[in-house]
Curated annotation (Swiss-Prot):
Swiss-Prot/TrEMBL keywords: Chaperone, Cytoplasm, Nickel, Nickel insertion
Family (UniProt): Belongs to the UreE family.
GO (cellular component) term, any one: cytoplasm
Compartments where located: Cytoplasm
Gene Ontology molecular function: nickel cation binding; unfolded protein binding
GO terms, biological process: protein folding; protein-containing complex assembly; urea metabolic process
Primary localisation category: cytoplasm
Top-rank taxon: Bacteria
Gene name as annotated: ureE
A Pfam family matched in the record: UreE_C
Role played: Involved in urease metallocenter assembly. Binds nickel. Probably functions as a nickel donor during metallocenter assembly.
Protein name per UniProt: Urease accessory protein UreE
Keyword Cytoplasm: yes
Length: 149
């Protein structure tokens, strides 16, 4: 079994992608947080992945590349709640409440994105928050804030 220990590049940076045979390794956002991953590709080849602790896999990362072939990480769609608040105060209240639940989150300029949870959805409905449930491809996995000490 081949064990990958580094990320070589990302498929977004490769010119003439169509000239390569692409073997995909499909991972969930939970998988990419693991230190050691044993998984089969879409071509039924078993691989191991063990990256340095500070390295995290992202969609499109290339683990193997030669003149003809790429082995690429593909993150599966994640079931999420995308929250867009009416005001900054409302967003602060929602973020505080979800933080009390130790809910991991990602943020854009105008949105808070959290993994789907029926209790969180119920809270948002009860508080008449603007949100939508969607399946999206995350750029990186949900994780708890590493800045919190």
């Amino acid at each position: 079994m081949t064990v990958f220990k580094e990320i070589l590049d990302n498929i977004a940076n490769i010119k003439n992608v169509e000239s390569y045979q692409i073997e995909n390794i499909h991972l969930t956002s939970d998988d990419v947080l693991k230190r050691v991953i044993i998984i089969s590709s879409d071509q039924n080849v078993e691989y191991g992945i063990r990256l340095e602790e500070d390295k995290k896999l992202m969609d499109g990362d290339i683990l193997y590349k030669d003149d003809y072939k790429l082995v690429v990480i593909r993150l599966e769609l994640s079931d999420v709640l995308i929250i867009t608040a009416h005001t900054i105060g409302e967003m602060a209240k929602i973020a505080h409440n979800l933080g009390n639940r130790h809910m991991p989150a990602q943020f854009t300029e105008t949105q808070m994105i959290v993994p789907y949870d029926y209790l969180v959805e119920e809270y948002l409905q009860d508080n008449k928050a603007l949100y939508e449930r969607k399946k999206i491809k995350l750029k990186e996995a949900f994780k708890h804030c590493s800045d919190a000490k």
